[in-house]
Design a protein with these regions (language model features):
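Conserved "HGTGT" condensation-loop signature of ketosynthase/thiolase-family condensing enzymes
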Residues: 1-125
């Protein structure tokens, strides 16, 4: 609401993606709840799969990666994603980078104790 865009405008998500069974399952459920059927059409990746969990610094690094993904029209793969949990059935990018013209992107950061944030980025015009 505060971003003045529709959830249908988001066309890339940098997930919190800790590669833990509960987190990935619940993050997938949350994306389905927010985006409905559109969730299945949004490319998603996890930066943590490549750099690990940097705790308090994770959100800043992932925000920078999201901004660079918009600038370069490219998203990195989720490293080591070979057989996702059946409940994690969205468009998780794996294997190789994907070219993508990104207009709006979302970067999720979820912390211990319920400190949760989703940042929305827009392509500079």
């Amino acid at each position: 609401d505060q971003a003045s865009i529709s959830q249908n405008d988001i066309n890339y998500i940098n997930a919190h993606g800790t590669s833990t069974p509960l987190n990935d399952k619940f993050e997938t459920m949350a994306m389905k709840s927010v985006f409905g059927n559109q969730a299945y059409k949004i490319p998603i990746n996890s930066t943590k799969s490549m750099i690990g969990h940097l705790l308090g610094a994770s959100g800043a690094i992932e925000a920078a990666v999201t901004a660079l993904s918009i600038k370069n029209s490219m998203i990195h793969p989720t490293a080591n994603l070979e057989s996702p949990d059946p409940e994690c059935d969205l468009d998780y990018t794996s294997g190789h980078s994907k070219e993508l013209d990104i207009n709006y992107a979302m970067s999720n950061s979820f912390g211990f104790g319920g400190h949760n944030t989703s940042l929305i980025f827009k392509k500079y015009e």
